[in-house]
Amino acid sequence: MSLFFESDNLTLGYENQLVIKNLKISLNFSKNYEITGRNGSGKTTLIMCISNNFIGNTFNSNIYRKDTSIMEIGSSPSLMPELSLLENIKYFLFNENINETTISNVLDKYELDSFKSDLIGDFSSGMVKISEIAIADLKNPKVLCIDEPKVYLDENGVDLLLNLITKREKEGNASILSSQESIGAFTSIERSINLND
């Protein structure tokens, strides 16, 4: 199996305050993982570290990280409110070779095509989350990390998210979901990391 992230002593925190201590973790391409735990248990911190977006203290942890395409949909929106949806797509996919027809088809699938010229700042929280999921679908990274995947999504949005997860499983791409409890999104799961323990 091919690893994209591994540590035998992952310790994370902010300044001198520990959030995660001595976690042994190894993550493989083409596998699914879930991170669960109560508020404050370190779920967001861990998913940010895995996706290389963590700006806290690693306390000399031994971390192996393979250079790969990885995307994080965090608990806070990452899209730029002063840009339109289409401008955000072009910004986040600037290195990708994706044609306009593909973009239009994906936006249509997520019921966003008629909003592509609208500013993200005018979107509801649910529309912003669906837009981020649509961008993840277009980008199709080898590893997709989603923190609190169901937050802001209505029933249709949850279905669209689950369809994307299923598609990624069939394509052999890794997905990591982080929430207070399992959301049952995966048909097969390599490891569930419970940070309450």
What residue spans do the PLM features occupy?
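Catalytic Walker B motif of ABC-type/P-loop ATPase nucleotide-binding domains
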Residues: L144-E148, L153
